[in-house]
Amino acid sequence: MDRSGLVTGVKQGTCQISKKDMTYQVDVRHLEQRENGTYVDGILIVNKSYPLSADYDPGLQPETKAAFQELCDAAAAEGMDIYDGSDYRDYSYQVKIYHNYCSLYGWEKADTFSARPGYSEHQSGLTIDCNTIDDAFGETQEAAWLAEHCADYGFIIRFPKGKEAITGYKYEPWHIRYVGADVAKEIQKYGLTLEEYLGVDSVYAEPWQ
């Protein structure tokens, strides 16, 4: 258990943790390393601790695309204009994006809002940036609708406000990740990040070289 209370298991099963006079029952999740990346209980995790292979090139996943279309249709029915501003990016494209930000802001600042090559969720084909990549989007009715309803279509707000120390990235109200409706609703219900739900961290092993 770390200082924030995050518990990481080393094998599948359950464990019991006691703190002072309080006892908690904790599920231990199953972490599996596959050829393209790391899965926790069957969910692909991509963050600063868990990269994808450079040659992983799935494009936008069909299930993600279909679910997003349903989301957009539902939003439109309520007078909202939500659209795909950016989705899949391959490794080489992320190299260009990250290096450009590093040249403009330095790698320490870039790391707060841009993923290093191989560490971007966009390469998974499970992530979509809605509308415009602009902090002002967070003040729109579309952003409010997205935060309230995206879980119904299997998406989560991947980098929520106030969770920067956990996700490793600044708040991005436009950035949604497909995890399936059951998981998304549970994450939304308890106000979790994907890291908290899966019991993993998001920290680069070393400074950018």
Label every PLM stretch briefly.
Residues 22-209:
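Extracytoplasmic cell-surface/polysaccharide-interacting catalytic and binding patches
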Residues 1-31:
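Extracytoplasmic soluble-region selector
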